[in-house]
């Protein structure tokens, strides 16, 4: 009887466990893998059913049989999203709009999600304990046009060959333009890749791509007589691009405890992943990458691979592959509001200043804040707390640029609209672990961190990042991206031939470069402090050039037990000829 009771109890527990998990097969909604059927309206229907049937505490799985799925603008979810560090153009067409979900797993089982036109592939908003895994995101016809240089004559210009998937035409005004489903692009700039190695071409940075006067001299061969650049030898591959970034591949907002596992973004017209105002994000084997060594493409995303704006908790990014993107592999920061009005001793109006970062929530009652003088990047007054906050220039937060904020304690009298101050939200700042990743063959920088909480960067390979491999920034003047780094550990990484090109803030392989207009007038230090400062140890640098470390306005900097190996793979060219260049840095230890 006792054994029977145990068995009965086990059966009850098993059934309870099973009943608390509900599986939805996308095929049950009439969507089959490897068909030409538009998946967008099917996903709308499936997600509506999941939300309608959800019971509190239930775990839900939405599963795709392995294969290829096509998503088009027609029938997609239409949303007004304001996305940090992107163009604030609305509405947006969303292929998979996951909103107000709990305990949801979306399992692609190795599927390819292919998008057409101009879409936001996946969004996850206001959700808790969700897992996205085992799928890839790509576009059938990317907005970046990949071309190969066929001929280069100093007097006669360049002949180039668009990649087979590029749809193009010569417009009436004789300019080369690419086009696709609902879009047309004229590419003003480009990034040059070595045709054999896929490294960015040495000392080219952003190149102009003037195609005025273009003509087709043979099938899929375009002569651009005004495009003259001796660095682009035949065989060079150019990713022709613009500066727009309408949507990321994956958009996360107001989520708690999100995990993304074994997901690959092969192309997005903005960033690979953008997360804002989220708490606790884990990326495991996430990639913004090509489809293997045989992939004929050289590029991935139009901007950063991953970007975290105004998040808190812990950001964990491990064992990922980031390559071919047009900006950083990871960027972690908050956003300064500029003080544009002092209403009374406890009330200020703060404004989003950058043209690609506005329209979304900035803070909540109870959040801790501090104030920074823009020209010297020094803290003024004491930390304070938000009592109330509401949009000032609009009735609702969505689309707002300005906020009326009342604080718990009186605000220092010097902080007003004339004196140039920013407000930093300290509550929405994350701890970061960036470990075991490969970053290679990308434009600009390898990684960028601007958070006061503990940041560990370890066991990564930075391979031909073209600009600085690691940047610690902070800027209340241009990008308005917070903030100071108080405790950073950079250890056991390998850096291979970074700085083959020059980009913003790239003074050395590791560049600690806050934007400080009046450095001479600064009395405090921006980065570092009693929390632990910045420690760079047990790393290996393989380089052809001089600059290894640049630091500005740091209190507490340690560089020890690192190995520097010189090679002759490129000719030294960087204007910074110093191995270590320190400006206003104190409490320093340098021991190679």
Curated annotation (Swiss-Prot):
Signal peptide (UniProt feature, chain positions): 1-14
Enzyme class per UniProt: hydrolase
Membrane topology classification: Lipid-anchor
Gene3D superfamilies for this protein: Single-stranded right-handed beta-helix, Pectin lyase-like (2.160.20.10)
GO cellular component: a single term: plasma membrane
InterPro entries: Beta-barrel_GLAA-B_II (IPR056441), Pectin_lyas_fold (IPR012334), Pectin_lyase_fold/virulence (IPR011050)
Name of the protein described by the UniProt record: Alpha-1,3-galactosidase B
